[in-house]
Every structure is written in structure tokens, then in C-alpha cells.
Design a protein with these regions (language model features):
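Recognition helix of helix-turn-helix DNA-binding domains
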Residues: 170-206
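Intrinsically disordered, low-complexity protein-interaction/activation regions
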Residues: 56, 156, 160, 187, ...
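DNA-binding alpha-helical recognition surfaces that contact promoter or target DNA
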Residues: 30, 51, 128, 163, ...
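Basic, Lys/Arg-enriched C-terminal extension of HTH/homeodomain DNA-binding domains
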Residues: 2, 193-222
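Residue-level marker of regulatory loop/turn positions in helix-turn-helix DNA-binding domains and
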Residues: 7, 69, 153-154, 203
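Short helix-to-turn junction characteristic of helix-turn-helix DNA-binding domains
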Residues: 162-169, 214
């Protein structure tokens, strides 16, 4: 299997790593160096990512979606692509759907590759996807949360209500902040639970089940 994938490996490609967690930034950067990539910069903020692009002219950027307070990885990727229309873009995150960061996220740059950290059990798989992003930076690619997953059929408003529930807001508080009735929020919660595959028998602890599903889809199971 390794031999069939070797063709897709790009050696010595200039790469910048944008990841706000210092440990992940260090270990992943070291691992990708062993795979032959030229890691020009390892940064944790949007500002440093743009500065690294200006200094190093990378062929590809590997980005976490959630960079903490401020710009997201998607915002950074859009800025990088504006400066270089053919830079390869790869997102590596625990989130199964980026709308859990921001329900009104901008469109991902054309050709962006989205990888889930929990499904990438080896850096070899990540290295192959990075190479594909370099070879075909603008190729049409299907995004995993669009075609499948419990959140794929949920609207932006439902995602926001899901986040409100996870934050501990009551039905009355959610209704008040959204300017709608509590009955409307109750209906939305029932639709959300259906989308998440929560059985009707779970009514007594429905909120607990919804919160658990929220964190599972963030890659932070409880």
C-alpha cells in the first residue's frame, strides 16, 4: 500500500504550519520534517501566518480550524490564497463540522482539503494529503460535513441553538436572545435531537445527550 501512495509524495516542499497548540505544533512539525517537507515556519496566530507567507512563499499551508480568539483557520486560508492563488490549503482539526466554530463561516478556498485529526492515525496519511494539495491546489473536492454526518442537514440557526444548549442556556434564555417563543425553541431542539440520532426515549435527559453529541462533534467527547 505504501508503494502505491509513494507517487503522491512531494519532497522538500515549502510548508507553513498554523496551529495554536504548542505541543501539536512542535510534534507535528517534527513528524512532517521526517516525511521530507521543508517546514519554513510553525506559528500559532493569524498575524504570524501571514507574515510567514510573506517571508517564505510556502507552497502549502497546514492549518488548524480553531486558532482561539480572533481569526479562524479559514480566515487565514482565505488571506493566504488572496496573496497566492495557487497555495495548497490543508485543514487538520478535531471538528467534524466547522460551523461549530462559527455557524456563518465563509466558504472554504477552492481545493482545500479537510482532515479530521481523530481519523488521521498516521502522519503518512497527512503527508499524502499535503502532497495532493500541492500537486492539485484547486481541484474540486467533496467536503465531509456536506455529504454525511449528523450535522450535515442542520441549518445555521440549529447549529447556533446547539451551541447555546452546550453553553448551558435555558430554553427561555435562548428564546429571549433570539426574539422567538419558547415553543419555537422547543421545536428546534426536537429537530436537533432527531438530526443527532437521539432516541425519543431520552426526553428526560435530552439536554445531556445533546451536549454530549456537541462535544463529540468537536472531537472532545465527554
Amino acid at each position: 500500500m505504501a508503494n502505491c501512495c509513494h507517487h503522491y509524495r512531494v519532497k522538500n516542499a515549502r510548508l507553513i504550519l498554523v496551529e495554536d497548540d504548542p505541543f501539536t505544533r512542535a510534534t507535528l512539525g517534527d513528524a512532517l520534517t521526517l516525511h521530507g517537507f521543508d517546514i519554513r515556519a510553525r506559528v500559532g496566530t493569524a498575524f504570524d501566518a501571514i507574515d510567514a507567507q510573506r517571508k517564505h512563499d510556502p507552497q502549502v499551508a497546514l492549518l488548524d480550524l480553531d486558532l482561539g480568539v480572533g481569526a479562524s483557520g479559514i480566515d487565514v486560508a482565505i488571506a493566504l490564497r488572496k496573496n497566492n492563488p495557487k497555495i495548497g490549503i490543508v485543514f487538520l482539526t478535531t471538528y467534524k463540522d466547522p460551523r461549530l466554530i462559527n455557524s456563518n463561516i465563509p466558504s472554504l478556498p477552492d481545493g482545500a482539503i479537510f482532515l479530521n485529526k481523530l481519523e488521521m492515525n498516521s502522519t503518512t496519511k497527512i503527508a499524502i494529503q499535503i502532497s495532493l494539495a500541492i500537486l492539485k491546489p484547486l481541484a474540486k473536492r467533496a467536503l465531509p460535513w456536506v455529504r454525511s454526518g449528523p450535522l450535515s442537514s442542520m441549518s445555521a440557526i440549529q447549529i447556533e441553538i446547539l451551541k447555546d444548549i452546550a453553553a448551558g442556556l435555558s430554553t427561555a434564555e435562548i428564546a429571549r436572545t433570539r426574539g422567538v417563543s419558547e415553543q419555537a425553541i422547543d421545536k428546534s431542539i426536537k429537530r436537533i435531537s432527531k438530526n443527532l440520532g437521539i432516541p425519543k426515549s431520552a426526553d428526560s435527559n435530552l439536554r445531556v445527550q445533546i451536549v454530549r453529541a456537541y462535544f463529540e462533534n468537536k472531537g472532545q467527547g465527554i
